[in-house]
Amino acid sequence: MTPEVAINFRERAYSLLQADAEKIVKLIQVQMDHLTMPQCPLYEEVLDTQMFGLSREIDFAVRLGLVDEKDGKAILDRLERELSALHEACTKKKKK
């Protein structure tokens, strides 16, 4: 495999992971807009499942050498911060 092809595979893998992460961000944003998590545990389950699936995708890409471990961790850290903000917002709403 030529270096150019290897770089293209890495870029493509990272791009796909970012796209999947963006889908999860959109789910989180919908939740933030409606703050429905306390009333809808199913939606929380969907988010957890999506996060788990993405973490497995990232792990696979890291093991293949297509994505650096630190880059994969950065994607998950960003989503964890988004989820944390969602939980905080829902908790504040629940207390009101």
Curated annotation (Swiss-Prot):
Signal sequence range: none
SUPFAM superfamilies reported for this sequence: EF2458-like
InterPro entries tied to this protein: UPF0358, UPF0358_sf
A Pfam family this chain is assigned to: DUF1507
Covalent S-S links between cysteines: none
NCBIfam families per the UniProt record, alphabetical: PRK13666.1
Family that this chain belongs to: Belongs to the UPF0358 family.
Name by which UniProt lists this protein: UPF0358 protein Aflv_1873
Organism: Anoxybacillus flavithermus (strain DSM 21510 / WK1)
